[in-house]
């Protein structure tokens, strides 16, 4: 494999996982904070808020997993390697 392609693939993999983790990380923090505030205001709605929170956290985490998959493809099954 060409050294430039190898180094670009490693850099792209690092950027893919890094950038894929930033957005969901911020979103999960905001969602969790809002859920805690909602439970503090309405303790009787705790079950519904928690269920909705867990579902949305799973959706947000899937974005990070997609970034991880792209990074692994670039590192181990590189389509640009020739």
UniProtKB/Swiss-Prot annotation:
Q: What is this protein called?
A: ATP synthase subunit c
Q: Which Gene3D superfamilies match?
A: F1F0 ATP synthase subunit C
- Would the keyword NADP turn up in this protein's UniProt record? no
- Where, subcellularly, is it found? Cellular thylakoid membrane
A Pfam family annotated for this UniProt entry? ATP-synt_C
Membrane topology term reads:
Multi-pass membrane protein
Family under the similarity heading: Belongs to the ATPase C chain family.
What's the name of its gene? atpE
- Name the residues annotated as site: Reversibly protonated during proton transport: 61
Q: Which PROSITE patterns match?
A: ATPASE_C
The record's GO molecular-function terms, alphabetically, read: lipid binding; proton-transporting ATP synthase activity, rotational mechanism
User: What does it do?
Assistant: F(1)F(0) ATP synthase produces ATP from ADP in the presence of a proton or sodium gradient. F-type ATPases consist of two structural domains, F(1) containing the extramembraneous catalytic core and F(0) containing the membrane proton channel, linked together by a central stalk and a peripheral stalk. During catalysis, ATP synthesis in the catalytic domain of F(1) is coupled via a rotary mechanism of the central stalk subunits to proton translocation. Key component of the F(0) channel; it plays a direct role in translocation across the membrane. A homomeric c-ring of between 10-14 subunits forms the central stalk rotor element with the F(1) delta and epsilon subunits.
């Amino acid at each position: 494999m060409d050294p430039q392609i190898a180094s670009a693939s490693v850099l792209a993999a690092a950027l893919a996982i890094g950038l894929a983790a930033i957005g969901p990380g911020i979103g999960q923090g905001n969602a969790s904070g809002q859920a805690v505030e909602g439970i503090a205001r309405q303790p009787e709605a705790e079950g519904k808020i928690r269920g909705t929170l867990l579902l949305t956290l799973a959706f947000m985490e899937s974005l990070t997993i997609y970034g991880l998959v792209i990074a692994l493809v670039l590192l181990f099954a590189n389509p640009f390697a020739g």
